[in-house]
Amino acid sequence: VALINNQFLPYPYYAKPGAVRSPAQILQWQVLPNTVPAKSCQAQPTTLARHPHPRLSFMAIPPKKNQDKTDIPTINTIATVESTITPTTEAIVDTVATLEASSEVIESAPETNTDQVTSTVV
């Protein structure tokens, strides 16, 4: 155990020999592409190892535009309704029983008049 006295440490620091890495391990740490020095130390641009596609769980996917709206059928309110005039012929039957002022029973059939009436239905 080595005693390290430093003016910036309020108490003496004891370094353990097992905590010191070998030069080969330190070299591996310096070669890693993920290490980025502080911004003040970046004299030359460094390349960061990035994934070509970020994970989908971290991506915010905006909803589709047509999901926000409810499909409402378009109704053309300007279109005019053309009414077709259809002539309709109805038979009107008038049944008139002619009664005389006498008390005798009339055995004849009642008169039947049939008139043709034409009306227009809109």
Swiss-Prot record:
GO terms for biological process: lactation; protein stabilization. Keywords: Glycoprotein, Milk protein, Phosphoprotein, Secreted. It comes from the Eukaryota. The keyword Glycoprotein applies. Glycans are attached at T74, T84, T86, T89, T95, S102, T118. It is found in: Secreted. Its main location: secreted. GO terms for cellular component: extracellular space. Mammary gland specific. Secreted in milk. The keyword Phosphoprotein applies. InterPro entries: Casein_kappa. The modification Phosphothreonine is found at T98. The modification Phosphoserine is found at S102, S119. The record marks F58, M59 as: Cleavage. PANTHER family: KAPPA CASEIN (PTHR11470), KAPPA-CASEIN (PTHR11470:SF2). Kappa-casein stabilizes micelle formation, preventing casein precipitation in milk. Belongs to the kappa-casein family. This is Kappa-casein. It comes from Rangifer tarandus (Reindeer). The lineage of its organism: Eukaryota, Metazoa, Chordata, Craniata, Vertebrata. The gene is CSN3.
